[in-house]
Amino acid sequence: MASKRLMLDVEEEDDESGACGQENFDPHDADMEYQAKRRKSAVQETPLQWMLKRHIPASTTVLSPITELSQNMNGARLDGTPKSTQRIPANRTLNNFNSLSSRTLGSFSSSCSSYESGNSLDDEYMDMFEMESAENHNLELPDDLEVLLSGQLKSESNLEEMSNKKGSLRRCLSMYPSEQPEEAVQEPDQETNMPMKKMQRKTLSMNDAEIMRALGDEPELIGDLSKPCTLPCLATGIRHRDLKTISSDTLARLIQGEFDEQLGSQGGYEIIDCRYPYEFLGGHIRGAKNLYTRGQIQEAFPTLTSNQENRRIYVFHCEFSSERGPKLLRYLRSNDRSQHTHNYPALDYPELYILHNGYKEFFGLYSQLCQPSQYVPMLAPAHNDEFRYFRAKTKSWQCGEGGDSGIGGGGSRGLRKSRSRLLYAE
């Protein structure tokens, strides 16, 4: 009730002042008074009050600045004079101001909540208005319709001006590609005083097949690579390519003395029969020695203290030269290599051979060179007990060193396993 009385008192005072003003009305004084009040209200008006004015319901006559400006511009085009220069009666101005202030005070509480949204909308409206004004300022519309249809839609000068201006962070595709070539992106020069890093180069690693292929290109050499082989070796149809293999014909020629000149007066050969004793006693090559365990190989081939310049040839074989003979030959070569680890490729026994297809083939071709001239197979039924005994004896090396030192059995020098069979290659 108190607020209503206050508003009625204010309206009565305004009516009285308006009545007094009508008696002594002077158009020039009213205009000056209106301009002064307008400047004063613009100075004292806060952004909050201005926003509250914008949010007054549509029934009032107060409009937003953009709408008012557009109406003024339209009115200026229609009437010929802008509305800002037209004089407004003082009474209507004062009445509008009073009613506006009363309505503003009444809607203050409801308008505070929408301040933030109005502020953001106002910023967008102002940006759009500035863009429209800039486009209208630069746009020159032709008067003739024919020129409008045949001319360019956009002038190049406007495009250049817009490109020179700093745009927003968003990128857009230009429909007018520039003729200037794009500058290549150059990396910054590195400092010349930087220390040089050492490059680690990978060493060439050759497998066994490559090494054997390389050795195959060279002439047949003995184990220490110092001399060519005395006996001709087989190149094809052999089982053990890492071992020098000779045929039964070559061994027969060696026994018959055809290679004595190459061996020299103090040289010689020796045949190692790796079969079991009952096989050896049943028939063997003339002059052969029976060695079937690794311990016997170690005793028969000790380490030499001095270099032997005389050539000595050793031919290994068993019944078929498939297992026992090649194993003992490789064992001898392995021990020999281990004794000369720091003096490669020196060897005490460099010239070792394996007989192709063993005693069985040699006996079938040259039985006259065998004594006694007989052939007892390993699996002969009459020697089953002996076979089991010697077989177990030669396999005892797999269970450890000690005892009898059969194939692989213990001895003064243990067998070191090699990752490559080249260790035994001659």
Curated annotation (Swiss-Prot):
It comes from the Eukaryota. One of its GO terms (biological process) is spermatogenesis. It is an enzyme of class 3 (hydrolase). Keywords: Cell cycle, Cell division, Hydrolase, Meiosis, Protein phosphatase. The active site is at C318. It catalyses: O-phospho-L-tyrosyl-[protein] + H2O = L-tyrosyl-[protein] + phosphate. SMART domains: RHOD. Required during meiosis. Regulates the transition from the extended G2 phase to the onset of the first meiotic division. It holds the Pfam family Rhodanese. PANTHER family: M-PHASE INDUCER PHOSPHATASE, M-PHASE INDUCER PHOSPHATASE DUAL SPECIFICITY PHOSPHATASE CDC25. GO terms for cellular component: cytoplasm; nucleus; spindle. The keyword Cell cycle applies. This is Cdc25-like protein phosphatase twine.
